[in-house]
Amino acid sequence: MTTLIYDSTFEGLLTAVFEVFEYKYDAVEIIAKENYTQENFFAETHEVITDFEKSDRVLKKLEENLGKEGISQLMLVYFSERKDLERLILSAVRHSINHPKQNILKDFGNDDMLEISKICRSV
């Protein structure tokens, strides 16, 4: 398990998502710096430095796959301040990359997409 620690900004989160793909991390957890506590001494940690070029690339790919409405929904998840917001956003990006022609945020058969939908309706 690799833990990516980012600076709590949306751009930092998108940079972390980029680095998941860049370094081909499979078992990964993304955590904001202020929420990080080292629970697993054997886990590898990687501190993410916010890179606006990387975050812009992720944003452009998301806009291509999900449109502006999809990005707005992911922003709502980010602003929800849930403990699992990073996992949900990473799951949405992975799902979007794997199914680029599909509106993955309407894929309610996927538990994470259903949870994102619930968050967006509650706001």
Protein language model annotation of sequence segments:
Residues M1-D51:
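N-terminal ordered "arm"
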Residues N40, T45-V123:
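Charged, alpha-helical interface segments at or near domain boundaries
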